[in-house]
C-alpha cells in the first residue's frame, strides 16, 4: 500500500489590524511574541531563532533582529498598530521597541509588566569575575 503524501499546512492570512507585542527580555535571550487582542499568537521570534548563539543572544542587536523578524511576519497578516508589553531586565528592551517602530508598526502604548517580588524567592548569588 502506497504511503499518503504528507501535506504541508499553509498558514492562512489573518486580517488583524491591531495587536499586542510581548517583549520578554531576560539576561540570556530576548523573545518577541505578537498576539491579537485575545492573546492568540500571530507571529513570534527570538534571538536564538535569528542564529545568535551563546552570549551574543543577549545583545541589543540580537533583540533588534528578532523584533524586526516578528514584525515582518505580523505585517503579512495585516497588522498596523500595536501595544507593547515589555517584561524582564535584559539589555534588548529598548532596541526591540525601536526596531518595531522602524519596521513600520504604529506603537500606541508601552507597558512595563516586569514581575517584581515582594520578598519572594532568594535571588542568585552575585558573580565574582
UniProtKB/Swiss-Prot annotation:
Pfam families: Ribosomal_S11. The keyword Ribonucleoprotein applies. InterPro entries: Ribosomal_uS11, Ribosomal_uS11_bac-type, Ribosomal_uS11_CS, Ribosomal_uS11_sf. It comes from the Bacteria. Keywords: Ribonucleoprotein, Ribosomal protein, RNA-binding, rRNA-binding. One of its GO terms (cellular component) is ribosome. The keyword Nucleus does not apply. GO terms for biological process: translation. GO terms for molecular function: rRNA binding; structural constituent of ribosome. Located on the platform of the 30S subunit, it bridges several disparate RNA helices of the 16S rRNA. Forms part of the Shine-Dalgarno cleft in the 70S ribosome. Part of the 30S ribosomal subunit. Interacts with proteins S7 and S18. Binds to IF-3. PANTHER family: 40S RIBOSOMAL PROTEIN S14/30S RIBOSOMAL PROTEIN S11. HAMAP family: Ribosomal_uS11. Belongs to the universal ribosomal protein uS11 family. This is Small ribosomal subunit protein uS11.
Amino acid at each position: 500500500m502506497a504511503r499518503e503524501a504528507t501535506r504541508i499546512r499553509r498558514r492562512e492570512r489573518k486580517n488583524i489590524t491591531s495587536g499586542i507585542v510581548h517583549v520578554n527580555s531576560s539576561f540570556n535571550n530576548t523573545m518577541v511574541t505578537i498576539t491579537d487582542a485575545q492573546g492568540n499568537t500571530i507571529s513570534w521570534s527570538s534571538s536564538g531563532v535569528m542564529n545568535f548563539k551563546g552570549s551574543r543572544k543577549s545583545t541589543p542587536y540580537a533583540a533588534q533582529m528578532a523584533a524586526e523578524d516578528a514584525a515582518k511576519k505580523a505585517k503579512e497578516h495585516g497588522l498596523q498598530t500595536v501595544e507593547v508589553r515589555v517584561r524582564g531586565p535584559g539589555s534588548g528592551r529598548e532596541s526591540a521597541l525601536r526596531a518595531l517602530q522602524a519596521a513600520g508598526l504604529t506603537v500606541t502604548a508601552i507597558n512595563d509588566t516586569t514581575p517584581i517580588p515582594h520578598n519572594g524567592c532568594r535571588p542568585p548569588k552575585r558573580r565574582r569575575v
